[in-house]
Amino acid sequence: LDVLHNESCIYAADEPIEFKLRIKTKVPNIGDMSFRILVWQADETPIEIAFTKTFANINEIGEYDVEVAINKHNLAPGLYKLTIILSGGTSNANSENLDYVYPAFVFEILHADGTARTWPRQWGWVQLRDVDVKLIEE
């Protein structure tokens, strides 16, 4: 796994998390492939999961490079781990777990402005950043 554009693995709350993986297949005819990406709190509590769309149909033995971008993670400031699970199978059936990496990497989320203000754990782990509020005039 190669982390792209951020070797320190410290991200602002509004910054995408991007990485590249190399997949090596040892058997032919795997078929459709997708990822499940699981985000864990530093204490091993699962926080978020993403199910990707099928990104390839693999029928040949070989090596394949894949880029992944988590554009809006909504994570609150803190320390996290990422698990990447590679799944195979047709898109209209249950997929089979082919392989996984845990932890794929450890990363930290800071406030969007880069400051290190306190984020009390009782506030939660997911940050809702797209909320509109307006005053209702009488």
Task: Describe each model-derived feature in a short phrase.
Residues 1-138:
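Localized sequence-composition bias
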